[in-house]
Amino acid sequence: MVKTVDFSGRPFHFIGIGGIGMSALAYVLAKRQLPVSGSDLRSTHITERLQGVGAHIFSRQEATNLELFNSSPERVLETVSVAVNGTQPSYPNGNGKTFSDSPSLLLQETLPQVICSTAIAHNNSEYAAAKEKGCPIFHRSDVLAALIRDYQSIAVAGTHGKTTTSSLIGYMLLKADLDPTIIVGGEVDAWEGNARIGAKGGYLVAEADESDGSLTKHYPNIGIVTNIELDHPDHYQTLDDVVKTFQIFETQCDLLIGCLDCETVASELTPAITYSLDPSKGADYTVQNVTSNHKGTFAEVWERGNYLGEIRLTIPGSHNLSNALAAIAVGRKLGLNFAVIADALFTFAGAKRRFEQRGQCNGITFIDDYAHHPSEIEATLSAARSKVDGETISRVVAIFQPHRYSRTATFLKEFATCFKDADLVILTDIYSAGEVNLHNISGQDLAEAVENNHSQVIYEPSLKGLPQVIPDLIKPGDLVLFLGAGNLNQIIPEMINTYHTASTQSTANAMVETSINC
């Protein structure tokens, strides 16, 4: 018998609940007043946010964590209680009764549904215990797939641009007063996190991940494919393998929107609605007269040959203009007025770790970006280069932490040439993300490859060493980008503080700004 995710009141337990994808699902379920618990080895603002909506978080991954919901019904209600207008929540059991009306209902099937991601090994103590106890075990994509079926759903897929595009669409629907539920792979200030709960049965905007093949589980009303490239070589051997995953996804979408600027999308998929930055490609949505300056990116938008109006984006780069076109296509399909769409695009401030400004100090701007694939790095550095004006910004400095041995080895040639828009490249050793180094590759190998194509390359293997090395390498007028999907961004505050200390020792008139800025 095929197991199905149960939203009628049975508890959920997430192994690794603090992950960006897992926490978004846990948040939505908790806000739907379902009992939620989970474990994570690190306490973060993400786990604190989950606790704030009633999730019980364990700091260790142990078999006993699964026994939380085997305690008394009163204990369960106390554990998962959420302040909803100052009242105790009710957990519907699907039969017209609620757990708060009749706590004994909680004793029915109290073994939790256990949710895990691809990162959780099968010898994990909680996973092994869940299997032994007979708990229903689901991959996080199973929960997302069930939610997609539960709403009027918009699923954003693609090798690059998923988080920004899904965040843009979610923000647009929010500005249009459509009260969407949103599940994305990054944090957005507009909803103070990576998820938002909206109207029951209303719109759901979700980021749909292809990295492990689970994209094929989703059946959205509207699907978007931003682009298709070979990535995640730990799962896919060839581009054809990736294409097959997206082709299955296409057949499961009621309507597909695709970007014709990606040759693979244009040749391998048949989207019903198309968009492109190039007017000559005949897409349904395109742009003309594109200009960029310190105030943003400006463009005229055309819909099937008819002029719609002008947009202005504050998030930089042609890749983000493409993401905006995807959002416009969705908005128009849903019947939104173009003025509402344009206002949302202008006021959208971006997602965290997507060209996110983390601070400024003595004429240096520090940027955090999740780019970890050669194409993403190239697009991000191109956006950075567009900001160089010779006055406030004069150089682009790229600090990159490679992510996964398999990706570094597979794309070594592409990594070697993707830093052309950086004036200075600083590389660290590879962030393993739990991989074993079967490729016998190191950050030093990457540094040597980049050095063959770039005159200014520095290799500092240790993250701990970067705050001591970098202050001597940067200067006023630099735009410093921290690139990668690993933990490089964690040293940014220390980096800014170290540079501030060093600069104030040599400059008596150093300017001190608020917050992390100096």
From Swiss-Prot:
Its localization reads:
Cytoplasm
**Is Transmembrane included in the keywords of this UniProt record?**
no
* UniProt EC number: 6.3.2.8
Gene name of the record: murC
**Reactions performed catalytically:** UDP-N-acetyl-alpha-D-muramate + L-alanine + ATP = UDP-N-acetyl-alpha-D-muramoyl-L-alanine + ADP + phosphate + H(+)
Q: What does this protein do?
A: Cell wall formation.
Q: Where does this protein hold ATP? A: 158-164
Keywords, A to Z, come to: ATP-binding, Cell cycle, Cell division, Cell shape, Cell wall biogenesis/degradation, Cytoplasm, Ligase, Nucleotide-binding, Peptidoglycan synthesis
- What GO cellular-component annotations does this UniProt entry give? cytoplasm
Any one GO MF term held by the record is: ATP binding
Q: Which GO terms describe its biological process?
A: cell division; cell wall organization; peptidoglycan biosynthetic process; regulation of cell shape
Kindly report, in one word, the top-level EC class recorded for this enzyme: ligase
The protein's annotated pathway: Cell wall biogenesis; peptidoglycan biosynthesis
Family the entry assigns: Belongs to the MurCDEF family.
Pfam families named among the record's database cross-references: Mur_ligase, Mur_ligase_C, Mur_ligase_M
Listed as disulfide-bonded, the cysteine pairs are none
Name of the protein this chain belongs to = UDP-N-acetylmuramate--L-alanine ligase
